[in-house]
Amino acid sequence: IPRKMSNVNSYLAAKTDDFAKILEHEQEILYMMAGQVSQNKMQEETKKKTASKKTAKTILDAMGLKIVPAKKTEIMRIKKLLGQDASRFYAAWKVINKRTQRNFDDFLKEEGDIETKLLWHGSRNENWISIMQLGLVLCPVTQITGKMFGEGIYFAPKAHKSLGYTSLEGSYWVGGKSNRAFMALFEVAYGTHYHTDTSYGIGRNFGYNDLQRRLKGAHCLHAHAGSVLRNDEIIFYKENQVS
């Protein structure tokens, strides 16, 4: 992505293994920019409607979002699910993306009575506006970065695992430098799940059709801690299985 760089060398690959990291970082920037562009368009539309004396909408209305402070009972549950990181809790909000929630609800109706779970997802601070507005999307960059279990949306049952992907100072996977970070609990359609404790035979292009060949009717892949993972990961290959 063309832009001003303070030190070009820091953006260059020193070894082959750096290619995937650089491409993933550039993709995250594009994802963030897409959300910002969409938000700016909505702000302009809101201003025009207000100026023409039509019913004024808030930015959140234009983005299709409803955000309210979490209730006391919800906060208690969040802290419980944070486990060893409960002391890091600062504040919580309930975010409803009307479009993704509608798609999720429709999926549950089609599938019938299937189990849902609340699972953690961590990301850098700058990504959250896009995530709230666009939802979690299946990103083509996974074909390049070679995520261990293919082209999916990744979650963790343990908060500490997801914390490593946030901007928090010292975060394990992204080397965060911030004293504040954000994580989210997503309701997901866990349903029928394919269990594995190895990535053997699961290529970087592994997707929903591949999952069905492993276990017909499976909604997700549950990778258990063991020989290749320190913590469980649960991967979904359809966007409408995530709220």
Predicted regions and their residues:
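Segments that shape or occlude catalytic/ligand-binding pockets
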Residues: 47, 52, 105-243
